[in-house]
Amino acid sequence: MSQQLKKRAKTRHQKGLGGRAPSGAKPRQGKSSQDLQAEIEPVSAVWALCDGYVCYEPGPQALGGDDFSDCYIECVIRGEFSQPILEEDSLFESLEYLKKGSEQQLSQKVFEASSLECSLEYMKKGVKKELPQKIVGENSLEYSEYMTGKKLPPGGIPGIDLSDPKQLAEFARKKPPINKEYDSLSAIACPQSGCTRKLRNRAALRKHLLIHGPRDHVCAECGKAFVESSKLKRHFLVHTGEKPFRCTFEGCGKRFSLDFNLRTHVRIHTGEKRFVCPFQGCNRRFIQSNNLKAHILTHANTNKNEQEGK
């Protein structure tokens, strides 16, 4: 690059001399030797490449009319170095833009994380206080836990007076209500015409569709038909009296036809009593829900006798 610039400068200098006599020629008439020497003296320029810049130093006696002027040098500088400088500026601006964009994205992520943390903290403190009474009532978790014998909701059961024996007895025979609004949104309707059943997921739907299928498995003893062969085998144990499910606790060995009955029986050995009496002051616990319901009726009869005595 440096050699090319020197060559171009030399060529332009020779053109700038035009028809002037060489340095060894005789001086013209009418001009002194000093004036002529100043006229033909070339521009003293030093060219160098310094990290992308052109450094030049014109001679102290350079003439403004010379072809090899500051204007020419400026053009050379623009032609050789303007574009890379612009590219460097563009790159700097791009980096600044990416930096700002990254900061904005990071700020957005921090904001989202903060929002999620606030939401989780809000849920942890307890949103249930602001829920509608209908949801906190019979459709609440406390109500369902009570119906399974775990605990009584604080404040009692909505719409039921436990001091009234009739309402208490009626409540003892009730089952947990179904949240129809929730089921209508999440359940899958049975596609069979005339069937209004709704299932919670596809696995339950596939199992339910077997009901509408042909009942090819018929009991030879009583003629009852079943969709699945496993159901027929379980039913046939009623006729044979076979009890394949045996209690493995030491000293027991009691046998059952159904695995459900075995699981209920095992609670006797484990001492698990899941169903608790909800009445205040009564801490009775029971293995089966039917025993709890029967026990609740005793409270109803006691309250009735007390009212009659008054």
UniProtKB/Swiss-Prot annotation:
One of its GO terms (biological process) is male gonad development. Residues 1-15 have a biased composition (Basic residues). Residues 1-35 are annotated as: Disordered. GO terms for molecular function: DNA-binding transcription factor activity; DNA-binding transcription factor activity, RNA polymerase II-specific; RNA polymerase II cis-regulatory region sequence-specific DNA binding; sequence-specific double-stranded DNA binding; zinc ion binding. Expressed in kidney, epidermal keratinocytes, prostate epithelial cells, bronchial and small airway lung epithelial cells (at protein level). Expressed in malignant kidney and several carcinoma cell lines (at protein level). Expressed in embryonic stem cells, kidney, epidermal keratinocytes, prostate epithelial cells, bronchial and small airway lung epithelial cells. Expressed in embryonal carcinomas, seminomas, malignant kidney and several carcinoma cell lines. Induction: Down-regulated upon retinoic acid addition to F9 stem cells. Keywords: Activator, DNA-binding, Isopeptide bond, Metal-binding, Nucleus, Repeat, Transcription, Transcription regulation, Ubl conjugation, Zinc, Zinc-finger. InterPro entries: Znf_C2H2_sf, Znf_C2H2_type. It is found in: Nucleus. There is a cross-link at K231, K233 (Glycyl lysine isopeptide (Lys-Gly) (interchain with G-Cter in ubiquitin)). Belongs to the krueppel C2H2-type zinc-finger protein family. This is Zinc finger protein 42 homolog. It comes from Homo sapiens (Human). The gene is ZFP42.
